[in-house]
Amino acid sequence: MTILNLARQYNQFQQQVGNTLDSTYEDMIPNLFSSSFIKIANGIVLATNRSLLKDQLENVRKVAGSWVIVSKEEIPFQEQNRCLIRYHLMSKDLGSYDVMAILTMDQEGKIQRNEENYYQIIE
């Protein structure tokens, strides 16, 4: 597994969460995220392990409504276990965001850390 392949799977996962909150996306969590997964958004820690991710995503989905992910860039770092992804998140209830995220992959090929920054798109 390369970090860029993992980044693409992450964006597909986000797209699925944005489309529906059925159990299909829940099955993807242990395959994509390490048990010690950490999620940070705009400097705020949102999840300190994989088991907290489902609730965090459901809470965001309730507030934001459905959303669509449009991938813009995937840039590998010199370290082969890290990359930057940039995408647009267009939500039904909270508007559109230009998002930049640094993903870190663990030895097992799973996302260990996600540091996201959201910038609202003003149209």
Give residue ranges: language-model regions.
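A beta-strand edge to alpha-helix "cap/lid" segment located at domain peripheries
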Residues: E58-E123
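Short histidine/acidic/glycine/proline-rich micro-motifs that form metal-
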Residues: Q16-V17, G43-L46, M90
